[in-house]
């Protein structure tokens, strides 16, 4: 039986620490704590309206994916990992991760409510799993690999790393290109916070696979899971580019295809198995965006000092800060 799943009936408290490396991962995650209200999107509204319609359509598809994906991650943490795992230090990490994923989910909802005032269009995005076949397909794939009745713990951790890494990564990179255009500062700030968090989540899954999982999946199974994730990302990116009529400034879908393969090979390395694609990085400027090397600058400077409500909606009241100097 896996060590992570063995109950220690004699242990009721977290101290004394028995798994210091896992505890350090938890403390690292704890240090990144933030809230969804800490980002100002007031400037983004004008940028969004000025954005060409095809480009807006591309980013709408990304938002539709994000609002669904984080809820599925939360579902897996609450119904599977947090019920099964018995090592307290690991359980602390996943408890903190679940809280972070709730912040991410709220942040994506704020983004949709801020940028898309039409309620019917908002609902189409919030109902992404029903309105977008590829998003539904991705959700089904995640649930398939997270099923504890069909997959070992090792297989599920590989799948979880693929979700937190592969399924999210291209979308993070696409949003980050808005920073190069000097637009959408709030969306970019959210993206930097969330991508950094997800990098730690993904890296921790790889750490557990390499250091705690006794029945590590065969390399061919790891490759199968990762390649399936890449194929889903390809399908989603093609769908999003079709919605944008192929016109998104800064990158092509072929560049995103290559990047996700480069990223996946690095994930293979972290899981101590052979690379699959052997391709270079088409976005060398995004090196810091890889896993837990996400840009950390200005995190504390972005903490709010003043607040303003950007969306006039009593049923969805949230406050956003004003300090122009933060950008």
Swiss-Prot record:
Cystine pairings recorded for this chain: none
Amino acids binding Fe cation 1: 70, 101, 104
Any one GO BP annotation for this protein: deoxyribonucleotide biosynthetic process
Keyword flag Metal-binding: yes
Record's keyword terms, sorted: Deoxyribonucleotide synthesis, Early protein, Iron, Metal-binding, Oxidoreductase
Active site residues according to the UniProt entry: 108
Cofactor: Fe cation
Catalysed reaction equations from the record: a 2'-deoxyribonucleoside 5'-diphosphate + [thioredoxin]-disulfide + H2O = a ribonucleoside 5'-diphosphate + [thioredoxin]-dithiol
EC number of this enzyme: 1.17.4.1
GO molecular function: metal ion binding; ribonucleoside-diphosphate reductase activity, thioredoxin disulfide as acceptor
Coiled coil start-end: none
InterPro entries in alphabetical order: Ferritin-like_SF, RNR-like, RNR_small, RNR_small_AS, RNR_small_fam
Family under the similarity heading: Belongs to the ribonucleoside diphosphate reductase small chain family.
Known partners and oligomeric status: Heterotetramer composed of a homodimer of the large subunit (R1) and a homodimer of the small subunit (R2). Larger multisubunit protein complex are also active, composed of (R1)n(R2)n.
Function: Ribonucleoside-diphosphate reductase holoenzyme provides the precursors necessary for viral DNA synthesis. Allows virus growth in non-dividing cells. Catalyzes the biosynthesis of deoxyribonucleotides from the corresponding ribonucleotides.
Protein name as it appears in the record: Ribonucleoside-diphosphate reductase small chain
Naturally occurring in which organism (per UniProt): African swine fever virus (isolate Warthog/Namibia/Wart80/1980)
């Amino acid at each position: 039986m896996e060590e992570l799943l063995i109950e220690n009936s004699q242990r009721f408290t977290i101290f004394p620490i028995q798994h210091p490396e896992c505890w350090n991962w938890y403390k690292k995650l704890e240090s990144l704590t933030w809230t969804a209200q800490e980002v100002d999107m007031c400037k983004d509204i004008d940028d969004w309206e000025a954005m060409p319609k095809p480009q807006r359509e591309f980013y709408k598809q990304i938002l539709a994916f994000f609002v669904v994906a984080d809820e599925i991650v939360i579902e897996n943490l609450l119904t599977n990992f947090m019920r099964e795992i018995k090592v307290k230090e690991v359980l602390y990490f996943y408890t903190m991760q679940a809280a972070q994923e709730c912040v991410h989910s709220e942040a994506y909802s704020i983004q949709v409510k801020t940028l898309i005032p039409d309620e019917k269009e908002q609902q189409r995005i919030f109902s992404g799993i029903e309105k977008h076949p590829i998003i539904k397909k991705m959700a089904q794939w995640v649930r398939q690999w997270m099923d504890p009745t069909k997959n070992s713990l090792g297989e599920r951790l590989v799948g979880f790393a693929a979700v937190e890494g592969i399924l999210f990564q291209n979308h993070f990179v696409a949003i980050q290109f808005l920073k190069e255009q000097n637009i959408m500062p709030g969306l970019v700030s959210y993206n930097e916070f969330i991508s950094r968090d997800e990098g730690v989540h993904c890296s921790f899954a790889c750490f557990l696979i390499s250091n705690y999982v006794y029945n590590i999946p065969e390399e061919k199974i790891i490759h199968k899971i990762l390649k399936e994730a890449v194929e889903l990302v390809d399908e989603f990116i093609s769908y999003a580019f079709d919605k944008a009529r192929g016109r998104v400034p800064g990158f092509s879908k072929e560049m995103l295809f290559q990047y996700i393969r480069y990223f996946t090979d690095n994930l293979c390395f972290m899981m101590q198995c052979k690379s699959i694609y052997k391709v270079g990085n088409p976005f060398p400027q995004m090196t810091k965006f890889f896993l837990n090397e996400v840009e950390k600058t200005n995190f504390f400077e972005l903490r709010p000092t003043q607040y303003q409500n950007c969306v006039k909606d009593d049923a969805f009241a949230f406050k956003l800060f004003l300090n122009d100097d933060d950008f």
